[in-house]
Amino acid sequence: MSGSGPAMASLEPGLAGSLNRGQTDASNVPVPPHHPVPHAQTYLDELISIPKGSTPGFSFRKLWAFTGPGFLMSIAYLDPGNVESDLQCGAVAGFKLLWVLLWATVLGLLCQRLAIRLGVVTGKDLAEICYLYYPRVPRVLLWLMMEIAIIGSDMQEVIGTAIAFSLLSAGRIPLWGGVLITITDTLFFLFLDKYGLRKLEAFFGFLITIMALTFGYEYVMVRPAQTEVLKGIFLPYCPGCGREELLQAVGIVGAIIMPHNIFLHSSLVKTRAIDRSKKEEVKEANMYFLTESCLALFVSFLINLFVMAVFGEAFYHQRNEDVHNKCVNSSVSRYASIFPINNETVSVDIYQGGVILGCYFGAAALYIWAVGILAAGQSSTMTGTYAGQFVMEGFLQLRWSRFTRVLFTRSLAILPTLFVAAFRDVSQLTGMNDLLNVLQSILLPFAVLPVLTFTSLRPLMHDFANGLLGQVLMSLITGLVCAINVYFVVDFLPTLRGLGYLIPLGLLLVAYVAFVTYLLWTCSIAHGARFLARGRYNRFSFDVTADVPGLAGPH
């Protein structure tokens, strides 16, 4: 049996011994070593101590100590891609799809709960666990899938930030200039953690507050009908909806649940000092992290709601000609030319959305919108960079210096964006948003299936392994994501013409299905289908009920 990397090689003897005897001996279960590779200097170097107290029950002091990772995670729910999806959904469907936003956020919370549990119980993030359990080829493929997801997300975030700079400068800063500014300030802000982890988390909290205030201001100014908003949130139906509304609903799910965010969150929870040998401390950490995540995602839901409701109230089924005429007679008349004079329904994006707000409610609304987009883009770009670092460290076990690793992970995402920004105008650039949201949805199984696999693996998770209800819920989410992806493919195929497109797409589709099937196979083994286990994959089939030596977890 061939090893796959130093850490994997260290696991093979125990596994081989167990296979030779044909037993599921707990002492031979391959588990990750406590410190597989020493980390270079990163966000995770500082551990936040948790106050000790004998007072039983919930403690707000402890909740405050655990507060931070959940709000950083929630920024992925507020990036420019989400904002654009929100405003398009409001303009196309009004308030009819607010319930989709609510339940997509709930589904995202369920995924983040698994990421929390994996990081807290094992002391390792999802990428590190993948490195130790998957053979070389599957784990390299998983790393590539996550890098593609991060690059796609980063393109949305950097483009959104560049558009914000363009709006704030009245077009004086070109898109490529905005991208260059984003590169510089992101690298600067990323080194804020040298002054303390809590200061960095406070800075992210400040950016979220800016988003809440700016988008909340737009909500108060437009004054949507509150009864209709509540009906849209709590009544799960869409009267009179067709294909266009369905595409928007599917796009919401793709925009809300980001694959790399699951990897990110499993890393962020490692920043709290938890004694993993004590089951009660692990249980308490899981509870407080989940509470914080619920609060953070509630805030993100409100901010997304503000955007969707504003455009659902003011711009639902607006015509280009009406918007053009309104802009001509406004204080931002220089933007009127971007809306053609015809009777077609206006198609909005981040750029046009800000312009429309300026045309209807004054220049202040435009600039406040741009500030909100700037905060969304800046914060999500920073967390995307951290996700890239953690994914690369975990999957490849790199020992690079801090600056080299930050520069490399930034370049992977920034260079494609800079190239696109230099040769496209605003309307073409923002039109990429739908495609990039589809990309996130397509790549989501490569995060959901591994985290479901390992949180169901009792040798790794002990008493914190997924129960039957958790397994069923996450299996339903995985099925929903796969169904969405099938819908996208079926909807996209008729737009292609000629074998030059169909043949490469067909090959990619076959490879995609094969890899998802592989992940489903290993996930099934972890869930107890031992008859599927062969060779090294017996590591996914052990039913361990006793302590497993070597795992720094609760016993």
From Swiss-Prot:
Glycosylation sites: 329, 343
Record's catalysed reaction(s): Zn(2+)(in) + H(+)(out) = Zn(2+)(out) + H(+)(in); Fe(2+)(in) + H(+)(out) = Fe(2+)(out) + H(+)(in); Mn(2+)(in) + H(+)(out) = Mn(2+)(out) + H(+)(in)
Expressing tissues: Macrophages; spleen and thymus and at lower level in liver and lung.
Residues on Extracellular side: 82-90, 169-172, 223-245, 313-354, 424-434, 494-501
One cellular component (GO) term of this entry: nuclear envelope
Keyword Transport: yes
Recorded topology in the membrane: Multi-pass membrane protein
InterPro entries reported for this sequence: NRAMP_fam
One Pfam family per UniProt: Nramp
Topological domains, Cytoplasmic: 1-63, 111-147, 193-201, 265-292, 375-405, 456-471, 522-555
Subcellular location: Late endosome membrane; Lysosome membrane
Keywords: Endosome, Glycoprotein, Ion transport, Iron, Iron transport, Lysosome, Membrane, Transmembrane, Transmembrane helix, Transport
UniProt keyword annotation of Nucleus present: no
Membrane-crossing residue ranges in chain numbering: 64-81, 91-110, 148-168, 173-192, 202-222, 246-264, 293-312, 355-374, 406-423, 435-455, 472-493, 502-521
Molecular function per GO: cadmium ion transmembrane transporter activity; iron ion transmembrane transporter activity; manganese ion transmembrane transporter activity; metal cation:proton antiporter activity; transition metal ion transmembrane transporter activity; zinc ion transmembrane transporter activity
Top-level taxonomic group: Eukaryota
Main subcellular localisation: membrane
Described function: Macrophage-specific antiporter that fluxes metal ions in either direction against a proton gradient. Localized to late endosomal lysosomal membranes, delivers bivalent cations from the cytosol into these acidic compartments where they may directly affect antimicrobial activity. Involved in iron metabolism and host natural resistance to infection with intracellular parasites.
Protein name (Swiss-Prot/TrEMBL): Natural resistance-associated macrophage protein 1
Species whose genome carries this gene: Gallus gallus
